Every structure is written in C-alpha cells, then in structure tokens.
UniProtKB/Swiss-Prot annotation:
Residues 105-168 form the S4 RNA-binding domain. The gene is rpsD. Belongs to the universal ribosomal protein uS4 family. One of its GO terms (molecular function) is structural constituent of ribosome. One of its GO terms (biological process) is translation. GO terms for cellular component: small ribosomal subunit. Part of the 30S ribosomal subunit. Contacts protein S5. The interaction surface between S4 and S5 is involved in control of translational fidelity. This is Small ribosomal subunit protein uS4. The lineage of its organism: Bacteria, Pseudomonadati, Thermomicrobiota, Thermomicrobia, Thermomicrobiales. PANTHER family: 30S 40S RIBOSOMAL PROTEIN, SMALL RIBOSOMAL SUBUNIT PROTEIN US4M. It comes from Thermomicrobium roseum (strain ATCC 27502 / DSM 5159 / P-2).
Length: 217
C-alpha cells in the first residue's frame, strides 16, 4: 500500500498550519513551523515566496486545500481517502461528519488515540508490523474499521520489546478521548462508542468544502 515517505514538515508548510504529524516534536520549540521566521511563512518550493502574494484563491483551490489538509492529517493517499468518502456518502447523516467518524475509526488512528504511538505515522507502522490484536486476533491492516465493543491490545510477544516497556510509563501522561477507554496494566483499550464531531481533535478543517470538492468531480 502506498504511503508518503517525504519530509512531513513540508506538508505543514504547504497547508500553512501545524498538522501535528511528528507527535511530541510538534508541541515543542523544535517544530520548524514555530522556528520559522514570520517573513518566511510561505509554501515550500521554488515558487513558494510568490504564492503568498498571489491573487485570491478560487473556490476550487479552497476546496482542494481542505481536502489535502484532511488527507495529510490522517496520512492517507488519494485512492483510499476517496473510498472512505464514498462510504461516508452511503451512510445516513451528514457526509462530512460521517467521513471524520470513518477516519477516526481506523485502527492506526485508534492506536494513536490510545497513546500507544506518538503519531499516526508511527501507529500505522506498528500496526503493519503486527504488534496489535483486535478482539484477540492479530490485525495488521491500518485502515481496519473498529466498532463499539472492540478491544485493541498489544500482542503479548510485543510487550517484551523495549519500546512497549517504556510505553507503559510514558503513556500515563497521554489523555484518552471519551469514546475510548485504556488499561495500561494489560496494554489494551476498548472502543466504547463511535466519536461525535465535537470529540474529534484535529486542526481546523472545513469538511463541507471537502464534500463540495468531490461533488463536482
């Protein structure tokens, strides 16, 4: 499955906001977005400095930027993101809210929300390497959709690794959203229910513009 392997801080610069793609580093003074001089706050690339002073973006450009921003927050490429959008359209209710709920219900995101990884990118790698069980079964598909009642746990064999030994202590400082519960003694978490829009903590994204982007294609 394809994935972005380039510099992730470049993605934040392109969108003009912090997307929190590097975990704890994004909250500290070492974040390139924080360190960057205000006069150099423009998109990356040869023509970046001229883009800031360009004419007002078109409606399509605004829709595209919101779509790209949401994709990059969750670390998903276009084909898979479009599948998630199509599924959101089929569900009853607001398509934008459904899309966010589907993205939050991905296994790699739930691993991140439970505090078992510093970033979604790291969570995706841990899942792909088979370190987690879902309801007692090894699951290595990052896009797997969890459901209320599902139990996500670190594999007993993986708990012997140094990373997870340290994690048992460091995860104590990481808050867990209300729609999840966590037990650090068993290194597991439970999905209590699906999240509501207000409970999804991500950089501001106008999901209506994302819906409009795909509606015109």
């Amino acid at each position: 499955m394809g994935r972005y392997i380039g510099p992730v801080c470049r993605l934040c610069r392109r969108e003009g906001v912090k997307l929190y793609l590097k975990g704890e580093r994004c909250f500290g003074p070492k974040c390139p977005i924080v360190k960057r001089h205000p006069n150099k706050n423009y998109p990356p690339g040869q023509h970046g400095p001229t883009q800031r002073a360009a004419r007002r973006p078109s409606e399509f450009a605004l829709q595209l930027r919101e779509k790209q921003k949401l994709k990059r927050v969750y670390g998903i490429l276009e084909r898979q993101f479009r599948r998630h959008f199509d599924e959101a359209e089929r569900r009853p209710g607001l398509t934008g809210d459904n899309l966010l709920q589907i993205l939050e219900s991905r296994l790699d995101n739930v691993v991140y929300r439970l505090g078992f990884a510093d970033s979604r990118r790291q969570a995706r790698q841990l899942v792909r390497h088979g370190h987690f069980l879902v309801n007692g079964r090894k699951t290595d598909i990052p896009s797997y959709q969890v459901r209320p009642g599902d139990i996500i746990a670190v594999r007993p064999e993986s708990r012997r690794r140094e990373y997870f030994k340290v994690l048992e202590e460091t995860a104590k400082n990481k808050a867990v959203p209300a729609w999840l519960s966590r037990d650090l003694e068993t290194m597991s978490g439970r999905v209590l229910r699906l999240p509501t829009r207000d409970e999804i903590d991500i950089p501001p994204v106008n999901t209506q513009l994302v819906v409009e982007y795909y509606s015109r294609r």
